[in-house]
């Protein structure tokens, strides 16, 4: 299983959103994919039409960060079949406790 951690995912519009969605769709051809993404307006219409699991996390930004990392860490603890964690930003990984392989995408002004 691949675990995708992102703050940027459709139906929100943008380049990194398209990249994360395309990457997720491609990875579903290789293995099961689970996505943890931020809540976005109209997400229900989008989420019901994909062939992978998406868990949306909402709330105020600061609280969402801690709540989302808690949910991800619990998921990792209870799902030993995760092979790799892929994140769209270092901030998506900073509170994640795992010894699984981690891939962090770098884009825009982060370098």
PLM regions with names:
Residues 31, 52, 82-83, 100-101:
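A structural micro-motif
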Residues 1, 29, 80-81:
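Short, Lys/Arg-enriched, disordered terminal segments
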